[in-house]
Amino acid sequence: MLVRMIYVSRSVNPDSGSPTDSILASSREHNLSNGITGILCYGGGIYLQALEGGRNQVNALYHQIANDERHRDVVILLYEEIKERRFGGWTMGQVNLTRLNTSIVLKYSETHDLDPYAVSGSVSLALLEELMATASIIGRG
């Protein structure tokens, strides 16, 4: 059974350069061998990530993320059974949230500063789908 999970978290050390590099490298290797696909967005010390794959694999990965010392305030925004993947082309795509077009952000947010903690899971999914459709994903992985 395929599932999709979207979660948000804060970086424990947001000023340490680009924490996504090590996360992306390990994600792509792990995800490929476990049939997990998705997108990782990072900016302003916040991670927003969509994961798709088998229920057991996604659940196990989420538990790793929730216990990862690089993350805090981990919150699941969306968890659903799916018929097909929306992010199947990426073992882990990447989006820099600080470089988003303001008009895209305002479409899904109350202000020009995107706060994934303040929006629903369905809004987060719509944002991620738009980023995919507008080629805002900078790393295909």
Language-model regions, residue ranges each:
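Charge-rich, low-complexity N-terminal segments
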Residues: 1-141
